[in-house]
Design a protein with these regions (language model features):
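Glycine-rich phosphate-binding loop of actin/hexokinase-like ATP-binding domains
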Residues: 156-256
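Oxyanion-binding "anion nests"
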Residues: 248-251, 255-280
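Adenine-nucleotide phosphate-binding core of ATP-dependent small-molecule kinases
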Residues: 267, 271-280, 284-320
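Glycine-rich phosphate-binding loops at beta-strand->alpha-helix junctions
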Residues: 325-347
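Short beta-strand-loop/turn "lid" adjacent to the catalytic site in phosphate-handling enzymes
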Residues: 73-125, 144-146, 152-161
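Glycine-rich phosphate-binding/hydrolytic loop that grips phosphoryl groups
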Residues: 335, 339, 356-392
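Phosphate/pyrophosphate-binding loops at sites that engage ATP/ADP/AMP, CoA/4′-phosphopantetheine
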Residues: 72-85, 195-200, 313-325
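Short glycine-rich, Thr/Ser-proximal phosphate-binding strand/loop in the N-terminal lobe
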Residues: 4, 13-60
């Protein structure tokens, strides 16, 4: 048949992978090639099988990075001609009320207009997703193009967890409700955890944590999302690298008075808050380094983050009636920082979760009857698998 390009455009990065559709159908998960661009360090990493190359790159835009990645794929003979690419799937966070499907949505003129109309629902991620998708449509004009929205996974949440306690017309007429995010990761991790636990996907109960630059939690009952920490936008919930997380709405007028405009306040809350706002560093590794050097605010920021995650775990255990099959962790912090994970789970022995004293790793074998799993997030593969079902 052909090849699938899977694109995950973040606020300052792009992750792309190219897959052979026959290989995916045969159960192979390794892409033909992978590309990752990080704007802040001006580097692009390319992987072809076991070979990995890091390149210094001068460009600033997501479109340039996308084109660079495609050119490198082509030079490495991952594909020769544009018509070999039959499908392109782009991760997007939130397209609004009308684009709430857990499955990939084919991009039509109407879908594109609706997505553009709701671009501000995820101000850090939606704009680059739109930018790269448009570039891909021009380059691979003969292919089918899809968006896969994070929020679709959470469309199964009960109405009580979607509503805010505002006048009902805010929900019915304005469309203000909790959409959530990180849905592609959560959907994939639910499938993978159920397989590992040998539990039917429609019966598995999980607490999912995605802890990286963006952080959130998700309660899953009988294989469906029932609650999540992110809300109308991905700014809500846990504190994150540059996002403030939950905040009293009563402070908003004061912030507008201080910063001068709503636009500036939104920029501060999404791009200059969280760990960055408290410490000047967005990366947990650098925040920990500051803490080790005696920076009091860095220590406070880490303690606050750990406490927020602990509170959510407790709340979701109660929401799931303490019938939890596993806690599943993903994201850069969860996948690489076992010390932070260990501090998060300390004290949960009383509800059946017990971690080994060996602080070098956390695996399900080291726990009591509620295992903690660390699963590496792979949104690109999850999207490729999902979109393949739409085209075969």
């Amino acid at each position: 048949m052909g090849k699938i390009v899977s694109i995950n455009a973040g606020s300052t990065s792009i992750k792309m992978a190219i897959y052979d559709d026959f290989a995916i159908q045969d159960g192979q998960t390794t892409p033909l090639a992978e590309y990752r661009w990080e704007k802040d360090v001006k580097k692009a990493t390319v992987k072809f099988g076991v070979h990995k190359y890091v390149h210094d790159v001068p460009f600033e835009s997501h479109t340039e990075a996308f084109k660079d990645g495609i050119n490198r794929f082509k030079r490495a003979k991952s594909f020769k001609y544009s018509n070999e690419i039959i499908t392109v799937v782009n991760r997007a966070v939130n397209g609004g009320e009308l684009l709430q499907s857990p499955d990939p949505i084919e991009i039509t003129t109407e879908v594109q207009k609706e997505f553009e109309r709701n671009i501000d629902l995820a101000p850090n991620h939606n704009p680059p997703a739109l930018e790269v998708s448009k570039a891909a449509q021009k380059l691979f004009y003969g292919a089918k193009h899809y968006y896969m929205f994070d929020t679709g996974w959470h469309s199964t949440m009960p109405i009580m967890n979607q509503l805010y306690a505002l006048p009902k017309e805010c929900f019915e007429e304005v469309g203000i409700r909790a959409f959530g995010a990180h849905g592609i990761v959560y959907m994939d991790n639910t499938k993978r955890a159920a397989q590992k636990l040998n539990i039917s996907e429609d019966k598995v109960n999980l607490i999912l944590l995605h802890l990286g630059g963006g952080c959130s939690a998700n309660a899953v009952k009988n294989g469906k999302s029932i609650d999540t920490t992110m809300g109308y936008t991905p700014t809500d919930g846990l504190m994150m690298a540059t996002r403030c997380g939950h905040i009293d709405p009563g402070v908003f007028p004061k912030l507008v008075e201080y910063y001068g405009s709503v636009k500036k306040v939104m920029e501060v809350m999404t791009k200059k808050s969280g760990f960055y706002g408290l410490t000047g560093e967005a990366d947990m590794r650098l925040v920990k380094k500051l803490a080790e050097e005696g920076d009091e605010m860095a220590n406070v920021a880490i303690e606050r983050f750990i406490n927020e995650v602990r509170k959510v775990i407790g709340a979701y255990m109660a929401e799931l009636d303490y019938e939890v099959d596993a806690i599943v962790c993903s994201g850069g912090i969860a996948e690489n920082d076992t010390e932070i994970l260990r501090r998060i789970f300390e004290g949960y022995e009383n509800v059946g979760l017990s971690l080994s004293k060996d602080n070098t790793k956390i695996t399900d074998e080291e726990c009591c009857h509620i295992p903690v799993m660390v699963i590496q997030a792979n949104e690109e593969l999850a999207m490729a698998k999902a979109v393949l079902k739409e085209v075969i």
